[in-house]
């Protein structure tokens, strides 16, 4: 009866897998030569933009002026509970768009001076903000997750070593049981009799 159920289950699985395979395949997948060029493999649509433009043509290049951006750190208020001593900070950053043409070093120096003057005008509000960030220590063993993994590995290794030593001691005792005199009586000499040494010749 059990074999009948196993054969029935295998037959059903074969039917279901055969149906899914026929649904996934189509006539286009079976034949390599298709009737039209659009359906043939290796034919891609023609992109006219690739033929009309070349590298360095300069027709579509947009000259953008640089956008000055500043980044300001906004600290979040930390929770007072001992469960979460970490303070999360959020940094606002915007990306600057660089122009296609290079600028002279004098112009970039002027822009840096303008930025520093703008920061000074904002006053000590920006300078006095204390930002607390979580610093990952450079030493590998000062991290808590690494330290926990090392301790767990050491405990498991120590237990394995103790188990191995106990197994060796048990095997040694079992092996040595027959080699020492444990107070058992030795068989008497009458149990082992010598064969007669006389020889008879015919």
Curated annotation (Swiss-Prot):
Compositional bias (Polar residues) spans? 91-103
Q: How does it sit in the membrane?
A: Single-pass type I membrane protein
Q: Which residues form the signal peptide?
A: 1-18
- Print the keywords alphabetically: Differentiation, Glycoprotein, Heparan sulfate, Membrane, Neurogenesis, Phosphoprotein, Proteoglycan, Signal, Transmembrane, Transmembrane helix
Question: Where are the Cytoplasmic topological domains?
Answer: 171-202
Main localization (coarse): membrane
Task: Identify the residue position(s) of the site Cleavage of ectodomain.
Answer: 143-144
* Protein name in the entry: Syndecan-2
The gene that this protein is the product of is Sdc2
């Amino acid at each position: 009866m059990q074999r009948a159920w196993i054969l029935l289950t295998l037959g059903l699985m074969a039917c279901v897998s055969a149906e899914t395979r026929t649904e996934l395949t189509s006539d286009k997948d079976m034949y390599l030569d298709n009737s039209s060029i659009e359906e043939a493999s290796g034919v891609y649509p023609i992109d006219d933009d690739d033929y009309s433009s070349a590298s360095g043509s300069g027709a579509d290049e947009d000259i953008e002026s640089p956008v000055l951006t500043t980044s300001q750190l906004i600290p979040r208020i930390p929770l007072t509970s001992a469960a979460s001593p970490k303070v999360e900070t959020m940094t606002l950053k915007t990306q600057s768009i660089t122009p296609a043409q290079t600028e002279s070093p004098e112009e970039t120096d002027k822009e840096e001076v303008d930025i520093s003057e703008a920061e000074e005008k904002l006053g000590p509000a920006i300078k006095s903000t204390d930002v607390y960030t979580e610093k990952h220590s450079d030493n590998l063993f000062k991290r808590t997750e690494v330290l926990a993994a090392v301790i767990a590995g050491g405990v498991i290794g120590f237990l394995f070593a103790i188990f191995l030593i106990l197994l060796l001691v048990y095997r040694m005792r079992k092996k040595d049981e027959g080699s020492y005199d444990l107070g058992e009586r030795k068989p008497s000499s009458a149990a082992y009799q010598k064969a007669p040494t006389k020889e008879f010749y015919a």
